[in-house]
UniProtKB/Swiss-Prot annotation:
HAMAP family for this protein: RimP
Gene Ontology cellular component terms for the protein in this record: cytoplasm
Record keywords: Cytoplasm, Ribosome biogenesis
InterPro entries reported in the protein's UniProt record: Ribosome_maturation_RimP, RimP_N, RimP_N_sf
Single GO biological process annotation from the record: ribosomal small subunit biogenesis
UniProt subcellular location: Cytoplasm
Full protein name: Ribosome maturation factor RimP
Encoding gene (name): rimP
Length: 154
């Protein structure tokens, strides 16, 4: 079995033991540096990274193939990629970039095809001078989202 396939198989086995964790990204470069990015339904703890790292490291032979292994959690600054990530962030504010707009909106609902968000903006009054606050509620298809990042509010 090729090295990359062996790593993928071991990773799948490791994640099967921890169903609350899921893979965001797996990258194996030409010098056999393995970079695994994880997320979890309840976040990712250091021990989760250690457990997945050990499930791979303990089953690969460094005498056979020299490699480096890095297991990390998806940071808050990384864009959301999977529906499962959107689901765990319902009720949080996202910065969403599409081809036509960039908005900061509250994530209300998540389906397999799209998300529903709500945000407000100041717009000119239809009658008279000045501006009024308008609340927008919109469904955005995943295909239309170029980037979505969770905004951390302190």
């Amino acid at each position: 079995m090729a090295f990359k396939e062996k790593v993928k198989e071991l990773l799948e086995q490791g994640l099967a033991e921890y169903p609350n964790l899921f893979l965001i990204d797996l990258n194996i470069n030409d010098s056999n540096k393995i970079i695994i990015t994880l997320d979890g339904d309840n976040g990712v703890q250091l021990q989760d990274c250690i457990n997945i790292s050990r499930s791979i490291d303990n089953n690969l032979d460094r005498e056979e193939v020299d490699f480096a292994l890095e297991v990390a959690s998806a940071g808050v600054s990384l864009p959301l990629k999977l529906v499962r990530q959107y689901k765990k962030n319902i009720g949080r504010t996202l910065k969403i970039k599409t081809a036509t707009q960039t908005i900061e909106a509250l994530l209300l609902e998540v389906s397999d095809q799209d998300i529903t968000v709500e945000w407000s903006s100041r717009e000119p009054k239809k009658i008279g001078k000045g501006k009024e606050t308008v609340v927008h509620n919109e469904k955005i298809a995943y295909a239309a989202i170029q980037e979505a990042i969770v905004i951390i509010i302190f």
